[in-house]
């Protein structure tokens, strides 16, 4: 997170890509999520969407997978597809546990903003 905090995004993403080779570990999943978040930040919604689905197929840690799907909902909003965004966030809110680590609240807050 230090490189990210200092605004050295390119260096950070390079490091995250390396760490993200094994997403079965917490660090690998977290790193992969930050790579996806960086793509989202660059404004490429189609690529972000593809990266989320590719990430989901690699058996990542549940917390970071849920974060990625929350971000996917943000992608759908940017693409003007609020219906798909709501469905994505609702599936996270309904299907994710534990309920107390912030993920479910984050999904529900996104849904509330759409109303």
Listing of model-derived features with the role each one plays in the protein:
Residues 1-115:
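Acidic, polar-rich low-complexity tracts and alpha-helical solenoid repeat scaffolds
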């Amino acid at each position: 997170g230090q490189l990210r905090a200092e605004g050295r995004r390119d260096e950070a993403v390079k490091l995250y890509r390396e760490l993200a080779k094994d997403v079965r570990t917490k660090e690998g999943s977290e790193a992969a999520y930050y790579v996806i978040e960086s793509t989202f930040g660059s404004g490429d919604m189609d690529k972000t969407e593809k990266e989320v689905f590719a990430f989901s197929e690699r058996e990542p840690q549940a917390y970071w997978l849920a974060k990625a799907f929350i971000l996917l909902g943000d992608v759908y909003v940017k693409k003007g597809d609020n219906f798909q965004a709501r469905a994505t966030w609702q599936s996270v809110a309904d299907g994710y546990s534990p309920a107390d680590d912030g993920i479910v609240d984050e999904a529900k807050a996104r849904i509330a903003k759409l109303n």
